[in-house]
Amino acid sequence: QANDYKANADEFAGQLKDLDKKADSFTDSHKDVHALATEPVAGYLLQEMGIEDSTPEEFVTQSETDAGPSTKTVADTKALLSGKKVQLLVVNGQTTDAITDQLRSTAKTAGIPEVGVTETLPEGVDTYADFIGSTIDKISTTVK
């Protein structure tokens, strides 16, 4: 049994190295990319890919409250999209609301592409490596 654990751990470590290479490839070919996220679900992955998460801290903090972000905070956040200060909108498709819809609409009007992410493995994806790999692929094909 110990050999099985070791073999599985080695296989997983190899998959993680492949993911690092995939993320590094994006970083090498895309400089100064900024994203806005409806939720901080993909924050570590964006960082690993060299993408600056430009989501205002107030938006993140206020989004976690029952009241949600203030009108000013939403306006400031939308201004990042309409002013083309970011190149990507990252949307957690598992939790959307009216503010998410506003951000998506603003991004679409501004020509800012959107990529969907999830907090859990989507249907048809069985492994962590496939989950993260497919997210890297989606971001890579979305950001020009």
Language-model features: locations:
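Extracytoplasmic metal-acquisition and chelation regions
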Residues: 1-144
